[in-house]
Every structure is written in structure tokens, then in C-alpha cells.
């Protein structure tokens, strides 16, 4: 669940159209491997899974590929499959065909005192086109919330890929 959303107009100079500064709590799903970036620097790569819960009881397991700069002598053996982990960093969304990939560039990793509950918490930044149709709705309890859509475009090889996003803002006032 993201705390806040920033909506900006489309920029041709930006490659990352949707990104989030987040803290993810989850379970390691793929063991760590040290790899080389194109420019020669090394990084640690591993996978994590986190479950996003729905009030209706339908839970969605999210797979995230994580990369973190490798520090010489760092023990990557502690990143074991099935271990609980908390990762802070930048989460990006990439679409290729029908598949949506979540990639995270980690700034901090913690294996100690990790919450037993899966979560994604942070701030989402969206560069794209927001719909002019903004609806103010009410919950069963009478609390107001705002619903609107937007889409982001990126070029993958010679094809354009579109990611449609539905935003829900739980505030009583409509933004100006």
C-alpha cells in the first residue's frame, strides 16, 4: 500500500514512468547471485515474494527481482530461500507483451527483526496521462475516497507498451 502518489505530466527525457520509493517485507524466493552490470560493476541479484492482501480474501503474490550493488567481501550466503527480508529502495514497473515485471534497486537490506507480515509501503511517482474523469465515491461506512485512472507509455524495442493504473485516494477532499 503506497502512502502518497505524485502525478506528473509526460516527459520524453524520463525512462522510468512509474516508480515507487518503498520498503518491502517478504520472503526470499530466489537465492542471491553476484552478477556484472554492463559498465562492469558487480551487483547482487535475488528474488522476493510478498503477498498483497485484499479485504475480500483474495490475496495476490507479487514477485519482485531485487538488485543491490555488491561490496567486495560481502556474504551473500545469508540471502537464503525462505528467509524473511526487509528491502528498501526504488521499485519500478516494466511491461513486455502481456507480462508485468517488478524490479527493485535496493539501497538497504535487513534480515533481522523483520515483520512477519508481508507489505509494500512507500511513495509512488507516476509520469503519464491522468484521466479527466475523477470520481468521488463513498464506502459503506460513509467515508469519501477518490478514484481515477491513468496510463504510462514506454518504448520496448520498436513497440510501445502501455501500463494502465487505477488510483484510489482515501482523502475527503478532491485535489485542486
Walk through the language-model features, giving the residues of each:
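OB-fold and OB-like single-stranded nucleic-acid-recognition modules
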Residues: 2-176
